[in-house]
């Protein structure tokens, strides 16, 4: 194992045409690349192969965050155009946002959205602005009336009605994410029925995915990278389900990198404890896993923290080999793309 990992170690060549621009007609119609760590093998399957790998007493953990229509368009009092991406809702009328304009807004200045919603800039923290909505309505009211789904930057088109349903898991409950927990997008009701018939348990954590998930790693050395913060919650019910799973010799299966980060944040010395708050956990090769036994995930961007996490769990050489095979076999990549299972 290397002592000094470089961001460039996680680069790979991806033809642009393999980046999925739209979802498949069937949520569960994706392909599945399966990595067996013990045998060091990589095999090609369909997504229903995920359920085939689940055993009785396994615990499948998903992220129930809900994507909000977080992208707003408005103008300054001077008339200049403004684009606002809500990063985190702090209260009914207060939120943090990324703001794009010809000139950065000054503290105390106003942004007008659709004439009847007024936003005041009250603070700035690095790239984020603290904003207050001056209205009897809530920030969620504003977003659901005038916001747009914030599709990832590698999807080169405007969002449409199809995205409102498909860039959202069918089990999304808690509003607050600006990006979908994409491993969960493959699940339909038939998937859940099949898991229950296998004798698996199902539970949910929450991590509100922020725009930081798309930010590039700017440091050359991973040791110098500072991870973005995201809000998460692991409840006592989840901890109890994990304890029961362990007692029955089952495996904890994380559906997505967000679930992985939740569970590993909440687990210390092999014990998962309830936790609600911030996480900036950065998982890369050399990390000691304490909770998760198997990971279902999508394919991730070159040099991204998500790919680094997957390499930490699956083994660097094996995962990078699998990515090369995925490219050669023309898998669909990123949010609307195919899946990978590592066990």
UniProtKB/Swiss-Prot annotation:
Reaction(s) the record says it catalyses: 7-aminomethyl-7-carbaguanosine(34) in tRNA + S-adenosyl-L-methionine = epoxyqueuosine(34) in tRNA + adenine + L-methionine + 2 H(+)
InterPro entries assigned to the protein according to its UniProt record, in alphabetical order: QueA (IPR003699), QueA_dom1 (IPR042118), QueA_dom2 (IPR042119), QueA_sf (IPR036100)
HAMAP family: QueA
Keyword field: Cytoplasm, Queuosine biosynthesis, S-adenosyl-L-methionine, Transferase
Name of this chain's protein: S-adenosylmethionine:tRNA ribosyltransferase-isomerase
Name of the gene this protein is made from: queA
GO MF entries: S-adenosylmethionine:tRNA ribosyltransferase-isomerase activity
Disulfide bonds: none
UniProt-listed Enzyme Commission number(s): 2.4.99.17
Family: Belongs to the QueA family.
Family annotation (Pfam families): Queuosine_synth
Superkingdom of source: Bacteria
Purpose: Transfers and isomerizes the ribose moiety from AdoMet to the 7-aminomethyl group of 7-deazaguanine (preQ1-tRNA) to give epoxyqueuosine (oQ-tRNA).
Assembly notes: Monomer.
UniProt-listed GO biological process terms: queuosine biosynthetic process; tRNA wobble guanine modification
Pathway noted in the entry: tRNA modification; tRNA-queuosine biosynthesis
GO cellular component: cytoplasm
Localization, UniProt: Cytoplasm
Keyword S-adenosyl-L-methionine: yes
Species of origin: Coxiella burnetii (strain RSA 493 / Nine Mile phase I)
């Amino acid at each position: 194992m290397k002592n000094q990992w470089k961001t460039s170690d996680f680069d790979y060549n991806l033809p642009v045409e393999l980046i999925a621009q739209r979802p498949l007609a069937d949520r569960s119609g994706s392909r599945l690349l399966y990595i067996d760590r013990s045998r060091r093998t990589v095999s090609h399957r369909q997504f229903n192969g995920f359920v085939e790998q689940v055993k009785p007493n396994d615990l499948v953990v998903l992220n129930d965050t809900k994507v909000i229509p977080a992208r707003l368009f408005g103008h300054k009092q001077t008339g200049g155009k403004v684009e606002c991406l809500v990063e985190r809702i702090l209260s009914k009328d207060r939120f943090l946002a990324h703001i794009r304009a010809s000139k950065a807004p000054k503290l105390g200045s106003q942004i007008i959205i659709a004439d009847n919603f007024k936003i005041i800039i009250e603070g700035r923290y690095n790239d984020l602005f603290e904003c207050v909505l001056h209205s009897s309505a809530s920030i969620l009211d504003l977003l659901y009336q005038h916001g747009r789904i914030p599709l990832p930057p590698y999807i080169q088109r405007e969002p449409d009605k199809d995205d409102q349903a498909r860039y959202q898991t069918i089990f999304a409950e808690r509003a607050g994410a600006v990006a979908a927990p994409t491993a969960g997008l493959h699940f339909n009701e038939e998937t859940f029925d099949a898991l229950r018939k296998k004798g698996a348990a199902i539970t949910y954590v929450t991590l509100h995915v922020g725009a930081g998930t798309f930010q590039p790693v700017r440091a050359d050395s991973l040791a110098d990278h500072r991870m973005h913060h995201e809000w998460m919650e692991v409840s006592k019910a989840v901890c109890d389900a994990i304890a029961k799973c362990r007692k029955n010799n089952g495996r904890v299966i994380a559906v997505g990198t967000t679930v992985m980060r939740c569970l590993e944040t909440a687990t210390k010395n092999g014990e998962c404890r309830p936790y609600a708050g911030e996480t900036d956990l950065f998982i890369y090769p050399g990390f000691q896993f304490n909770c998760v036994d198997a990971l279902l995930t999508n394919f991730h961007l070159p040099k991204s923290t998500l790919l680094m996490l997957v390499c930490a769990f699956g083994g660097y050489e094996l995962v990078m080999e699998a990515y090369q095979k995925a490219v050669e076999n023309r898998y669909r990549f990123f949010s609307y793309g195919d899946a990978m299972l590592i066990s």
